[in-house]
């Protein structure tokens, strides 16, 4: 990610992948462009069913195409270094679920104890308190993941969140 260069809204050309060195601080090889369509920022990576998943937030220039502004999209590949193929949208802009909470979208997708989750932020608390300033609150919801083929379906944003998995002591 890193913003949208002028005139390059559909293909910003700002995403790269590269192999990490064994020390996890160096790189091996040269970073390679992967070109997520309408990329804005907020990249994430997962491996599901042998597929490599690259998820990201789309930019604010998606009018006139099947994508929408500031939603979480994903691409898949058989290799962590690509090539990646656009595979769809998994989370709409938070303003879809929480009126008045539109904004850029940051997320993480992860599995815990056999259940898949998506975390994200929205301005729900700010709006309920009647204040402004772009204050974001964290949310977590379930996300449908097909672990046999690596596809991800759309998640729904809620204020209820998820059920407690277990008690801590």
Task: Please report, for each region that a protein language model flagged, where it lies by residue.
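Carbohydrate-active catalytic/glycan-binding domains of CAZyme proteins
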Residues: 1-169
